């Protein structure tokens, strides 16, 4: 502190005819400047990517490139008790892949949930920022069970896959933005 300074002891010696002053050392301002902004711009970039992906999605829906309605044939591969799910599960076990997640709601209820929640979740993008026709949505009710670490866990989250033939939902544990 300046008030505790004693010339020659903890401050440079003062000369009677010198016009010098002491200034506190504040460190390297560049380090603080960049440290304060670390991570700030990536959040803004993610928001820009989400907006661009949402615009791309609405354009694709309006032009008829993708349909929001549920594709029952694709959804049955994720419907517990259906023959397509059992075949899919058996194929994954033979290949050494994890057991697929499954939905517990019927297709009409899933369809109404998709129509209600479409474009309200997190749209996934590729490395270039282009929308990859998938969206992660919290459906606010248990839609199915995801297979994690050897057991099935009930979940409200689902990844919706959009295509020109319709959508299908794959239950997932949480919103990890993959």
Annotate the PLM regions.
Residues 1-67, 143-178:
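Activation/maturation switch segments at domain boundaries
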Residues 58-178:
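Functional cores of ribonucleases/endoribonucleases
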């Amino acid at each position: 502190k300046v008030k505790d300074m004693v010339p020659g002891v903890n401050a440079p010696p003062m000369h009677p005819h010198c016009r010098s002053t002491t200034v506190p050392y504040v460190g390297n301002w560049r380090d603080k400047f960049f440290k304060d902004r670390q991570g700030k711009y990536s959040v803004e970039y993610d928001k820009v990517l989400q907006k661009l992906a949402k615009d791309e999605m609405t354009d694709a829906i309006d032009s008829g490139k993708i349909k929001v309605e549920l594709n029952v044939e694709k959804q049955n591969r994720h419907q517990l008790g259906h023959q397509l799910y059992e075949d899919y599960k058996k194929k994954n076990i033979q290949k050494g892949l994890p057991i697929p997640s499954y939905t517990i709601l019927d297709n009409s209820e899933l369809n109404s949930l998709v129509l209600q929640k479409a474009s309200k979740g997190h749209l996934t993008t590729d490395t270039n920022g282009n929308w990859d026709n998938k969206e992660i949505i919290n459906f606010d009710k248990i839609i199915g069970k995801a297979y994690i670490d050897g057991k099935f866990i009930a979940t409200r989250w689902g990844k919706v896959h959009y295509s020109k033939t319709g959508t299908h939902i794959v239950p997932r544990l949480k919103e990890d933005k993959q």
